[in-house]
């Protein structure tokens, strides 16, 4: 059974709300165990435990929060021992254009330095709304497309863990039995 950790830092509760939605998305794929943990309660054992990880951070000055960065800096003695995990990112920002995509890229860079395989999501969760670099929000996720982008990120992580860790090829995203585009986008294409 694949194991997914949704690890987040949340200052005002917005990133935590996103993390809960990401965890809901993970639960859409059967046979995947999920843990939801704030960075303040996590430790190195949680990182060793998981096969896949969704990292979430608020955007502070266009990048990762110092709390999230400090956690990974303190994990440096474990570098090269965590290689091969699957990772993705999500971030909240104060307003659109606040740098959440840059934060997701910074989170993925941290994971890449630890040898993780990282990905984005090409699905369209709403009109002109994707999670190529990870799920991003301005404030808390309120609109359906924002909620769905978090869930899709979690589901995609669970799919990749099922495929690469559990060997369940039928869980490949391209074989999914769900629409990879929103209703609005699908009807526009027809």
Task: State where each predicted segment sits.
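A generic structural motif
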Residues: 29-35
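N-terminal beta1-alpha1 ligand-phosphate binding loop
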Residues: 2-29
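Short hydrophobic segments within beta-strands
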Residues: 7-9, 37, 90
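Residues at the starts of beta-strands that form the adenosine-phosphate
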Residues: 3, 33, 86
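Helix-loop-strand module that forms the ligand-binding subsite of alpha/beta enzymes
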Residues: 39-127
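A generic "alpha-helical surface" signal
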Residues: 13, 62, 102, 144, ...
């Amino acid at each position: 059974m694949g194991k997914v950790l949704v690890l987040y830092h949340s200052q005002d509760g917005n990133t935590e709300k996103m993390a809960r939605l990401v965890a809901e998305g993970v639960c859409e794929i059967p046979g995947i165990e999920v843990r939801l943990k704030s960075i303040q309660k996590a430790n190195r054992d949680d990182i060793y435990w998981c096969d896949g990880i969704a990292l979430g951070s608020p955007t502070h000055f266009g990048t990762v929060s110092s709390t999230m960065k400090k956690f990974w800096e303190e994990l440096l003695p474990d570098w090269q021992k965590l290689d091969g995990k699957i990772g993705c990112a999500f971030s909240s920002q104060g307003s659109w254009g606040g740098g959440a995509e840059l934060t997701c890229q910074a989170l993925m860079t941290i994971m890449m330095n630890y040898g993780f395989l990282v990905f984005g999501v090409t699905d369209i969760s709403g009109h002109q709304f994707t999670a190529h670099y990870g799920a991003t929000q301005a404030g808390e996720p309120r609109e359906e497309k924002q909620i769905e982008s978090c869930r899709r990120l979690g589901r995609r992580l669970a799919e990749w863990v099922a495929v690469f860790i559990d060997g369940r090829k039928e869980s490949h995203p391209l074989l999914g039995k769900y629409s990879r585009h929103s209703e609005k986008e699908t009807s526009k294409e027809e």
